[in-house]
Amino acid sequence: MPSAKQRGSKGGHGAASPSDKGAHPSGGADDVAKKPPAAPQQPQPPAPHPPQHPQNQAHRGGHRGRSSAATANASSASCSRRLGRVLNFLFYLSLVAAAAFSGWYVHHVLEEVQQVRRGHQDFSRQRDELGQGLQGVEQKVQSLQATFGTFESLLRNSQHKQDLTEKAVKEGESELNRISEVLQKLQNEILKDLSDGIHVVKDARERDFTSLENTVEERLTELTKSINDNIAIFTDVQKRSQKEINEVKMKVASLEESKGDRSQDVKTLKDAVKEVQASMMSRERDIEALKSSLQTMESDVYTEVRELVSLKQEQQAFKQAADSERLALQALTEKLLRSEESSSRLPEDIRRLEEELQQLKVGAHGSEEGAVFKDSKALEELQRQIEGLGARLQYVEDGVYSMQVASARHTESLESLLSKSQEYEQRLAMLQEHVGNLGSSSDLASTVRSLGETQLALSSDLKELKQSLGELPGTVESLQEQVLSLLSQDQAQAEGLPPQDFLDRLSSLDNLKSSVSQVESDLKMLRTAVDSLVAYSVKIETNENNLESAKGLLDDLRNDLDRLFLKVEKIHEKI
């Protein structure tokens, strides 16, 4: 019995060793171990039968008690052996079941550990990918900062170019003001000369021929009409130039306002970039919180990459536009330099023309000394030359409007004409002195009449020249004054001339021819000056066209910058 109990206790302890996971087998072993002590108690119920004879029964009872104890011991021994075998079987069976269950549990735990390890590996890989994405975003932010730096440099360059254009506009405005002043001065001088000519004509009207008086009046009316037309043209040019200056000022003011707005936008973009950098630093510290929004972040990164690619393309287009603008400005500066060089060469050309004029004067004097008695042929040749000059000066008449643009330089030619008119006045005074010393004769009167007729023809030719050159009244009026004074003095002194002074009279006629040839050379010089002024006006028009193209490029640049600002704001909102 004790052995059975010990075995039952061992079986119970052996089955309870995997008690954490196999509680039911150990419970069954304990129940089996507890049942054997109940088996020997079954023969005890006959004991309570009361004996009839206590003494005999006591003797019989002792013998029967020993026999029953022996049988009970034998049966208990066999039962204990059987129970031990059963218990051993159950113990081994429980051990095998516990080992199988523990193996299955260990396998399950290993699978869970592998799954957890794979999850940790995926998480670390996602974390590395997220770190690489953040590094790429940092690099993109740095590239954005670099692009913003280049953008600021471009803005500074555009501001410098705009300052240069403003300076050029101011210089043009000052030159236009100077031109307007010169034109006003020229207008006053023309009006003064016209009034002086009217007074001279009124004084000479009493002494002159009636036909000459009528022609002079017609010429004066035509001259006043041409002067009024020129004055109207000058005022229109002044109004147009002032209007263009006001428009340029308004455009410059609008550009300055847009420049201020752009500078504010650049400052806001800088602040936004700084905020983006701060947010990126905070996001690096909050990597664990970004696991849930990893997919959305990847999609945002893809869209941002596409937008950055488009932004890079737009930046390249912006660089190309800036390069084209720079080339246009360089071409404009080169054209301005060439125009300045051509304007600096104008005084040398004028000086050279003056020297050629003096040489022509000397040659004309030498040729006229040898052709004293060939005055009629010379006058015919002079008329043909004047007709040729009229055909040539038709081109000048077509370029009068372009000359008005460069009237500042035309004033120099007018000043030279005034100086030449003074020289003509001096020569006229010399002629008057020569005529005052002369006498009268019939031959001399006929020569004077022929001279008057030739002068009338010359005045008719000069009328056409005045219609084509309305800016040159001083020279023609001085020539008319010479002719009128010569005719009046010849008419007053025609009857008291001595015949022996005929050669002196011819010399005065030669002097008159020389003065006419000098007028012709002066007209040629004026034609060359007008051609140079036309070329200069064409250059000015090309410069104005270049300025307009530069303004158009600046407008395109402003539109590109506005689009770039919109793209950057969209990127900032998405970040």
UniProtKB/Swiss-Prot annotation:
Tell whether Methyltransferase is among the UniProt keywords. Answer: no
Parts of the chain on the Cytoplasmic side: 1-85
Q: Which Gene3D superfamilies match?
A: 1.20.58.60
Please note every region of biased composition (Pro residues): 37-53
Q: Transmembrane segments in this chain: where?
A: 86-108
Q: Which UniProt keywords apply?
A: Acetylation, Cell membrane, Coiled coil, Cytoplasm, Cytoskeleton, Endoplasmic reticulum, Lipoprotein, Membrane, Palmitate, Phosphoprotein, Signal-anchor, Transmembrane, Transmembrane helix
Q: Which residue stretches, if any, does this entry annotate as coiled coil?
A: 125-193, 236-438, 507-575
Compartments (UniProt record): Endoplasmic reticulum membrane; Cell membrane; Cytoplasm, Cytoskeleton; Cytoplasm, Perinuclear region
Extracellular-side stretches of the chain, per the record, are: 109-575
Q: What is its main location?
A: endoplasmic reticulum
What does the entry report about post-translational modification of this chain? Reversibly palmitoylated. Palmitoylation at Cys-79 by DHHC2 is required for its trafficking from the ER to the plasma membrane and for its perinuclear localization. Increased phosphorylation during mitosis prevents binding to microtubules.
Q: Which positions anchor the lipid (S-palmitoyl cysteine)?
A: C79
Q: How does it sit in the membrane?
A: Single-pass type II membrane protein
Q: Does the keyword Nucleotide-binding apply?
A: no
Instruction: Give the residue ranges for region: Disordered.
Output: 1-73
Tell me which domain of life the UniProt entry assigns to the organism this sequence originates from.
Eukaryota
* Summary of the tissues where the protein is detected: Expressed in cardiomyocytes (at protein level).
Q: Which GO terms describe its cellular component?
A: cell surface; cytoskeleton; endoplasmic reticulum; endoplasmic reticulum membrane; lipid droplet; mitochondrion; nuclear speck; perinuclear region of cytoplasm
Carrying N6-acetyllysine, the residues are K21
Mark the residues carrying the PTM Phosphoserine.
S3, S17, S19, S211, S292, S367
Summarize the subunit comment: Interacts with REEP5.
Purpose of the protein: High-affinity epithelial cell surface receptor for APF. Mediates the anchoring of the endoplasmic reticulum to microtubules.
This one is known as Cytoskeleton-associated protein 4
Source organism per UniProt = Mus musculus
Name of the gene this protein is made from: Ckap4
